[in-house]
Amino acid sequence: MKKKANRLDAIKMIISSKEVGSQEELLQELNREGFELTQATLSRDLKQLKVAKAASMNGKYVYVLPNNIMYKRSTDQSAGEMLRNNGFISLQFSGNIAVIRTRPGYASSMAYDIDNNEFSEILGTIAGDDTIMLVLREGVATSKVRQLLSLIIPNIE
């Protein structure tokens, strides 16, 4: 069973960090990671993980994980690799407004995660394709907001 758990972890990691458009591409990536499996096994694994296909920014359909799964490996090197792929670019403050810049396509899901945490210090968010505007409660320290956001965006510093 451990072998299957490791394989599922590898699938989540690959899908989270690369644009994979077919089972054949995913099988090749898994082979590079040292996993030998058939297309039928991969198909069952994808079904178990509830993996779907969605259009990427370049119009190519790629595998994506369900919205609520955020996957991170535990080793420093691969965690750093994952942090570079979570979409966060920058955070700036002006008065009681914060602006988060993301890679294209990441803002909406990141705003969704912020809203679902129901931080009392953040009144609400508005998201576009690559920008999130947060309205902050009056008098909240930017350091507190940064600390709260670090629960969702680990590399926010």
UniProtKB/Swiss-Prot annotation:
GO terms for biological process: L-arginine biosynthetic process; protein complex oligomerization; regulation of arginine biosynthetic process; regulation of arginine metabolic process. Keywords: Amino-acid biosynthesis, Arginine biosynthesis, Cytoplasm, DNA-binding, Repressor, Transcription, Transcription regulation. GO terms for cellular component: cytoplasm; transcription regulator complex. SUPFAM superfamilies: C-terminal domain of arginine repressor (SSF55252), Winged helix' DNA-binding domain (SSF46785). The keyword Repressor applies. InterPro entries: Arg_repress, Arg_repress_C, Arg_repress_C_sf, Arg_repress_DNA-bd, WH-like_DNA-bd_sf, WH_DNA-bd_sf. It comes from the Bacteria. One of its GO terms (molecular function) is cis-regulatory region sequence-specific DNA binding. The keyword Isomerase does not apply. Pathway: Amino-acid biosynthesis; L-arginine biosynthesis [regulation]. It is found in: Cytoplasm. Regulates arginine biosynthesis genes. Belongs to the ArgR family. This is Arginine repressor. It comes from Bacteroides thetaiotaomicron (strain ATCC 29148 / DSM 2079 / JCM 5827 / CCUG 10774 / NCTC 10582 / VPI-5482 / E50). The lineage of its organism: Bacteria, Pseudomonadati, Bacteroidota, Bacteroidia, Bacteroidales.
